[in-house]
């Protein structure tokens, strides 16, 4: 499945990721109140969803930021845009 994130990052992701229990758990963990749990869940989601595209994703986000940093907010926004597309695929 081809996706384009909110920031404009384009990549292919495995459509079968919707069947991976680890992603379901990570999405649920991302809703918890504990910030450390949420961060760990975001890391897991990036790795599960993007796989080999993870470093290219970070480089893309870095290039979009004037300070050349990868912000937590940018990661969160892009993950949300991908997850929304995945949810639409499941429905």
Please provide the spans of the model-predicted regions.
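Short, surface-exposed, charged amphipathic helix/loop patches that serve as local interaction elements
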Residues: 17-91
